[in-house]
Amino acid sequence: MNANPKFLSADAHVDAAAVAPLPNSRKVYVTGSQPDIRVPMREITQADTPTGFGGEKNPPIYVYDTSGPYTDPDAKIDIRAGLPALRQRWIEARGDTEVLPGLSSQYGLERAADPATAELRFPGLHRNPRRAQPGKNVTQMHYARQGIITPEMEYIAIRENQRRAEYIESLKSSGPNGAKLAAMMGRQHPGQAFGAAAFGANALAEITPEFVRDEIARGRAIIPANINHPESEPMIIGRNFLVKINANIGNSAVTSSIGEEVDKMTWAIRWGGDTVMDLSTGKHIHETREWIIRNSPVPIGTVPIYQALEKVNGKAEDLTWEIFRDTLIEQAEQGVDYFTIHAGVRLQYVPLTANRMTGIVSRGGSIMAKWCLAHHKESFLYEHFEEICEIMKAYDVSFSLGDGLRPGSIYDANDEAQLGELKTLGELTQIAWKHDVQVMIEGPGHVPMQLIKENMDLQLDWCKEAPFYTLGPLTTDIAPGYDHITSGIGAAMIGWFGTAMLCYVTPKEHLGLPNKDDVKEGIITYKLAAHAADLAKGHPGAQVRDNALSKARFEFRWEDQFNIGLDPDKAREFHDETLPKDSAKVAHFCSMCGPHFCSMKITQDVREFAAQQGVSETEALKKGMEVKAVEFVKTGAEIYHRQ
């Protein structure tokens, strides 16, 4: 990869691989109470069951789709124009915002006036930023606490349900055995929800708009949806909903360009990224972010202190509240949906990290720790937190309260510094909620398995059930190059215990900046972890996809096995390495066991034999054993035979 290859806005184009529909899938939309509430889902078509296995119809299944218009063949994709402003009419209809005459951040104005950035700027934005009218609060939490169900909340309820009821009805009407099939395919193991309201003994039959509103009002969930990012498709982060995942992208001083970061974003959402964080620290941070936001159907998060540090040439001690405030406004007016802010790094906690194995590993945390020590005073993020809340509620930017003192090794897990900061984050949450500002809490980090639940329990207690958003955690430190696996283990566990969103880790963690392939690997690993957590919690309908794939596997519907899986391309590639011919796609075996030792084929043979003999499967097995016993004696009762 070249260091910062030349990017020109005139040449910008979408990556063709990111816009092709997935195999046997099509984009469908479910309409809500008004015509412009059109909720996207991915419909996966299945083949009929072969006649020998019953011959029934297998209706399509529906899965959560984060890819936006990119996988819709009917959508015209032009990244120079950006995505349609899906939520614009809803925002305008509320009548509590105003269009500004122009940018109001000093840095934004400077970039707009700089001729050197002209060929890099996003050309398709033809509207000025919005802000709350004086005295107004435009957060989804504020509306929820007023008893208002917004279009965003209705959209989310439809999206979370994934047409589960319609799928069960389609099974019932699939043929004479429809009722039996519906019971089988809808079966799900009871979960253990650890107190989550929507699961366990009190599991909801479906997610309703009122339930969404209530969870937002309580602070147990957030809808990251800046009024200046109307292109975003509403989604929710909370432990009573599907576990979500975040993908990190962003350039550095030594690698990547604007074009590559836009490609990474479209690639991440294709494979299931629910949100994307732009962690750019290199050149053209402002322009890179604009391109990403205008083309993103998912919420975008940032760490504003990174850009603020660039404005003072990397010298943490030179940071000021005024520079940081201007950065917040700059990014809020672009449309950033949530800010990671390390306001819990207090002066008193910094000495507690002295005896750590790995010290302070968070970039934002180390920046603020250095500032606190240089000035020997509390951080300006902590001191000005109420003023930050005023900015957040003017644009509906959500807090992601950063864990600047998270452990960077399992040696440091659950130490006094980490837990002291967590307690402070709980206190800051209460302040934000006083302003009706949405909050989620960031968590570790590196934590061995036996300490993971303690992290979750303390967070729920101290932060009053505000959504938890964790980086893994990594459960061991011995696997550079495989940290997507070491962290995926911890992610599945903490997701089960109650974490609402998991921040992915790629194979490049601790080693380098991820490329597109690494992004996909991290996404798929974390989709697995999130889904495993949904199953363990007992999320309604979570097992539908597993049941459909298992049925396809038992019936040797190879194409359906590939297509229902999280990564159809890799599944097909692995199968075709040893059985590449088209005939192998309908064969009743795979290359692992071959045609004579396939356990599923043997089971099918037993069932056929039972049907022919008019006996039960148990009797058929017994009868078959008796036949084989006679055959064994007749051939000499030898365990081994010479060829």
Curated annotation (Swiss-Prot):
It catalyses: 5-amino-1-(5-phospho-beta-D-ribosyl)imidazole + S-adenosyl-L-methionine = 4-amino-2-methyl-5-(phosphooxymethyl)pyrimidine + CO + 5'-deoxyadenosine + formate + L-methionine + 3 H(+). Pathway: Cofactor biosynthesis; thiamine diphosphate biosynthesis. The keyword DNA damage does not apply. InterPro entries: ThiC (IPR037509), ThiC-associated_dom (IPR025747), ThiC/Bza_core_dom (IPR038521), ThiC/BzaA/B (IPR002817). Keywords: 4Fe-4S, Iron, Iron-sulfur, Lyase, Metal-binding, S-adenosyl-L-methionine, Thiamine biosynthesis, Zinc. The keyword Phosphoprotein does not apply. GO terms for cellular component: cytosol. Binds 1 [4Fe-4S] cluster per subunit. The cluster is coordinated with 3 cysteines and an exchangeable S-adenosyl-L-methionine. [4Fe-4S] cluster binds at C590, C593, C598. Its cofactor is [4Fe-4S] cluster. Its EC number is 4.1.99.17. It is an enzyme of class 4 (lyase). GO terms for biological process: thiamine biosynthetic process; thiamine diphosphate biosynthetic process. GO terms for molecular function: 4 iron, 4 sulfur cluster binding; carbon-carbon lyase activity; zinc ion binding. Substrate binds at N248, M277, Y306, H342, S362, R363, G364, D403, G404, L405, R406, E442, Y469. Zn(2+) binds at H446, H510. Catalyzes the synthesis of the hydroxymethylpyrimidine phosphate (HMP-P) moiety of thiamine from aminoimidazole ribotide (AIR) in a radical S-adenosyl-L-methionine (SAM)-dependent reaction. Belongs to the ThiC family. Homodimer. This is Phosphomethylpyrimidine synthase. It comes from Burkholderia cenocepacia (strain HI2424).
